[in-house]
């Protein structure tokens, strides 16, 4: 959608920290100021891979929720997606959640990605795939800001042109009801996600990760993999 006069607003991604050491230092310094003393950032939950496996992974996947940890911690959906991904040889998985609203300013002030891997303390730009789990349509209102404030461009063409940006895919119970994410925002400017996975994750998501691994191994670009 264009503004009055046909001027396209600038929607540039935020400049975020990419150095894990700097993010860890921020975390150690400010954890007590986070909601619930940062319980939503602790990571290392049961069945989560240890960070020691990060370096040897051939494909790194961040499973991201559009709701807060408090709201979805008991959900089985992202845990199942993570388990499916872990079963693909060479894949490392971490999880990220919508931060509690009162933590936004603290994270933005220091350039910490709003989507932050709870175990790795890495933002989406450190991963190969950003897998967004969408349960209900209302959650999608959080998507543009979470992308931008995590350093991820909104437009597919820019994401495809930058090797440091992960493939952005969306799945989940609501994935078949996401027409708002499809099509072009302006001529030549596809919007928000690179692909939507519809169907049983046990089959579709596993196969997607296998295709990405194969493509990476052959030196294909993200666009060629898609």
Question: Language-model features: where?
Answer:
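Histidine-anchored nucleotide/phosphate-binding helix
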Residues: 46-52, 75-87
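A short, glycine/small-residue-rich beta-strand->loop->alpha-helix junction that serves as a flexible
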Residues: 68-76
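Glycine-rich beta-alpha loop elements in corrinoid/cobalamin-binding modules
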Residues: 100, 111-226
